[in-house]
Amino acid sequence: MVTSLFYFNGCSLLNFFDKQTKDMPRKHYIGRASTENFQKGIGEVLLGFDYHIEQYDNGPTSSYIITRWKIREGSEDSLSTEFKESKTRLIINGMIDNQSFEMNNGFSYDCFLEIQNFTYNGSDFIPNYEDTELNDEISNLIKNLSSFLSINQ
């Protein structure tokens, strides 16, 4: 059963459930990685798609790889809707499996890819996940990352 949460503020009624679903970034499970594959190998696969790592973040239960924004000119899909350009950033979250600790190899990670894509409409960047060119690129990236992780476990 799905319920919506409504909030009344002055003259406007906001449906938070619909907004949250609409703006939800895309996440994909890409496989299981060793510490070395998470820190080095994933970066090599990302470079093959022209995504450059901007930041690594290690926490007690997970590690993150965050790429720089990749800027692209409007594709045929976006030109028909008058979008000028888009920017895409990837976040790879490696959830640490605490049962997997090995003295020399560190931990194993369950890895998830999150895509953040925004298109410029002339005045603002707005979330957009309907670009065919982007979706094709992300599908290929997911296949390559999953393949790399399955081979190099």
Language-model regions: role of each:
Residues M1-S12:
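Sec-dependent bacterial lipoprotein signal peptides
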Residues S12-Q153:
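Ser/Thr-rich, low-complexity intrinsically disordered terminal regions
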